[in-house]
């Protein structure tokens, strides 16, 4: 019963993201109670839950198919940051908005991608492996890529970003792995509802950031929305093309598209709120990204499911 309820709510995540996005802009008071300081805590809990769903042996899966995993991870960190930087330059985005767009483009694949891959009837095992690999590599690549592409807009403290990611990502994931090893029964129980908990915290983070930055979003909505839509649409398209060029099967092509096109927007929001709190516009592309990539991903999943 619990598993079925958690699974049902989790699979409707794209719908909840859109609803929360609309509600947070229409009635900000519904989400403003969450608070900026809770963003990092929420993401840490999500990563802890992710760690509890993994085994140390799962990491060997990456080495069993290095070419496939390598293709996905290289595409993730090569395509999205460069594409985000190109959009920021070509659209002449304000400096703060440009940094926010590049920051979220430099983040790893998000756990929501695993849900969308499942809905699209693509390769879920590959999706989980890619998310895990890109999340671990992001500890070093996200700060470096953000500094590389956005450093000329604003001063970026790459070391501070690195320390935050270690605290928010690596430590909770490793703690979750240890917990599962030592307290297997309790970890198994928690892992049954961890996808549901992850969805709830992501929705709270998205709702809070959109509500807190409502005036900025409404003031720049056309520019913001255009930039974020192009970012993710390009990611989905180019990710799919990578699979086609390397002659992968349809299931793997769809998985690459979703993994490249969907980012860990929660990590982007956590880093933006921690390191650019004095620059409110930096957080807005990250928050809007969570809604946009879920919407595009779910529409693609629906289309692929009904494609003959």
Task: Please place each PLM-identified region on the residue numbering.
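Alpha-helical transmembrane segments of multi-pass small-molecule/ion transporters
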Residues: 1-308
